[in-house]
């Protein structure tokens, strides 16, 4: 592959969003490696609950970051609980949230979907200026395609942007962007991807998340875990080279990159800095490896 696709993606590498899990050590890693003008998103899980997400959000806000917490709908109890969350986030200056349904079989309260929580936020008077929703380039492991497609259509009026779920196949990502636009959904998109990942550390991190969260993580990410484990299965520069032109096309309306760090924050930022520097240096162009 040549440099064209990578060069097209270069502007998106300047200010990607970094997604992290709320763990004991991740705050230090973010503060040490992530520039203060970057956006950090904080996930929510059934095992840790929303409190861990909100706590890390508050601490990262205090460090000067723009933070986007995940408000998983099925972890919110009711409208009173939602109002408390909104007030707490408002107090630390959060104006952007990401609203997934939440990977939990039984809702904790009355919200059974992202749409139901989005409607309640709307009825509260739009307390956040930006709201993100999920897009699925590949089929969801537990939801049929027709449902996810309809859900995006239903949620689009309450959201301001889409974040694509992690997909390591550039051809699938390109086709998905085209399909979203063909359906008349015009929200800007952040494309989900990873930097280089240590597969062993990734599985170990999943194990530390607890039995339930770990089993769900490994079950829902089997495909790209396998891809990470084979030689030349996934290389982030090759991925960007193959999607770069599509991301840069005005019709795609891609706003940025969303880096799933899986808390390998240092590796992600070192990779990003190195690639940005090489793309800016015509004497040292990065090479995207070809497929085996």
Residue ranges and their predicted role:
Residues 69, 155-158, 191, 243, ...:
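Conserved, mostly hydrophobic/aromatic
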Residues 61, 90, 155-156, 181:
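Non-catalytic positions within long, well-ordered alpha-helices that form the structural scaffold/packing
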Residues 18-19, 45, 74, 141-144, ...:
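Glycine- and other small-residue-rich loops at beta-strand/loop junctions that grip anionic moieties
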Residues 2-147, 254:
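Active-site beta->alpha loop and helix N-cap motifs at the rims of alpha/beta catalytic domains
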Residues 18-24, 110-136, 186-248, 263, ...:
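Active-site pocket-lining/capping segments in soluble small-molecule metabolic enzymes
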Residues 155, 255-270:
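Charge-patterned, long linear interaction tracts outside catalytic cores
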């Amino acid at each position: 592959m040549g440099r064209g696709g990578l060069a097209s993606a270069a502007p998106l590498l300047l200010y990607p969003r970094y997604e992290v899990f709320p763990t004991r050590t991740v705050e230090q890693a973010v503060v040490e490696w992530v520039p203060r003008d970057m956006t950090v998103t904080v996930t929510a899980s059934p095992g840790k609950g929303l409190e861990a997400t909100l706590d890390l959000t508050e601490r990262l806000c205090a460090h000067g970051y723009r933070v986007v917490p995940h408000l998983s709908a099925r972890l919110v109890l009711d409208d009173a609980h939602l109002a408390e969350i909104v007030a707490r986030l408002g107090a630390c200056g959060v104006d952007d949230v990401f609203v997934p349904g939440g990977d939990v079989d039984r809702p904790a309260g009355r919200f059974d979907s992202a749409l139901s929580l989005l409607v309640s936020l709307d009825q509260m008077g739009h307390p956040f200026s930006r709201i993100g929703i999920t897009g699925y380039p590949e089929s969801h492991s537990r939801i049929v395609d027709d449902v996810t497609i309809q859900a995006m259509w239903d949620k689009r009026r309450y959201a301001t942007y889409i974040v694509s779920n992690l997909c390591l196949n550039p051809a699938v990502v390109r086709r998905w962007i085209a399909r979203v636009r063909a359906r008349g959904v015009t929200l800007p998109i952040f494309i989900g991807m990873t930097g280089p990942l240590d597969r062993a550390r990734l599985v170990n991190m999943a194990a530390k998340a607890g039995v339930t969260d770990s089993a769900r993580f490994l079950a829902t990410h089997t495909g790209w875990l396998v891809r990470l484990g084979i030689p030349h299965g996934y290389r982030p520069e090759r991925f960007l080279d193959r999607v770069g032109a599509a991301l840069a096309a005005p019709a795609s309306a891609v706003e940025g990159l969303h880096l799933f760090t899986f808390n390998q924050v240092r590796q992600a930022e070192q990779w990003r800095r190195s690639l940005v520097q090489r793309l800016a240096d015509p004497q040292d162009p990065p090479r995207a490896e070809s497929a085996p």
